[in-house]
């Protein structure tokens, strides 16, 4: 099921831009070419990774996984403790992933799991590490029932000079409806064949 951020969030200052950017036969308003699109994602369980790969097949551009210098534990309960502690301290875990020329990207599709109704701290690290001024950020979120939480609002707070488009909300890995849900979402945000 797809959900998007509220009108209230829009009215609080998040700018939604629908222009025309050519991306692998698609277009989003107001931007340039497929090489100017980055799909960056953080995934612990693999759900967000699968969504990111499917999205990348549809839109092209560059695909980058946001990885940590010290990854979270592979054990679910230990990971929960580590990630919750990071959330409580508003930690900014050090990223192993480096984007050498972020300035070349106009549009950043940003994928992450909803942890405690917001972005995981590695996403906060990523958003603070680069200048997103003037860029269009398009969130996509995997979740176990919490949908977007306040994640889009938190992205807008970290990137006040960016345009944020409607987010895609995907329960777990999206199942058999993912491709159709993704196509409908891409159409709503102005990406079309």
Q: What function would you assign to each model-found segment?
A:
Residues 1-18:
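N-terminal secretory signal peptides and thylakoid transit peptides that target proteins
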Residues 27-32:
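Boundary at the C-terminal end of the N-terminal hydrophobic targeting segment
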Residues 2-5, 33-74, 81-82, 87-193:
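FMN-binding flavodoxin-like domain, especially the glycine-rich phosphate-binding loop
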């Amino acid at each position: 099921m797809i959900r998007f951020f509220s009108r209230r969030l829009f009215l609080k200052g998040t700018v939604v831009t629908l222009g025309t950017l050519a991306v692998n036969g698609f277009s989003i308003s107001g931007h340039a070419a497929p090489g100017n699109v980055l799909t960056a994602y953080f995934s612990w369980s693999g759900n967000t990774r699968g969504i990111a790969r499917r999205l990348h097949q549809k839109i092209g551009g560059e695909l980058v996984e946001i990885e940590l210098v010290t990854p979270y534990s592979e054990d679910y309960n230990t990971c929960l403790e580590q990630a919750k502690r990071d959330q409580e301290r508003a930690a900014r875990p050090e990223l192993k992933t480096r984007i050498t020329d972020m300035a070349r990207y106009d549009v950043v599709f940003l994928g992450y799991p909803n942890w405690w109704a917001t972005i995981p701290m590695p996403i906060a690290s990523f958003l603070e590490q680069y200048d997103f001024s003037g860029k269009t950020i398009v969130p996509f979120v995997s979740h176990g029932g919490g949908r977007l939480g306040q994640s889009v609002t938190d992205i807008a707070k970290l990137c006040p000079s960016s345009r944020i488009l409607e987010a895609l909300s995907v329960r777990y890995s999206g199942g058999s409806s993912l491709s159709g849900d993704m196509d409908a979402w891409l159409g709503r945000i102005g990406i079309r064949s």
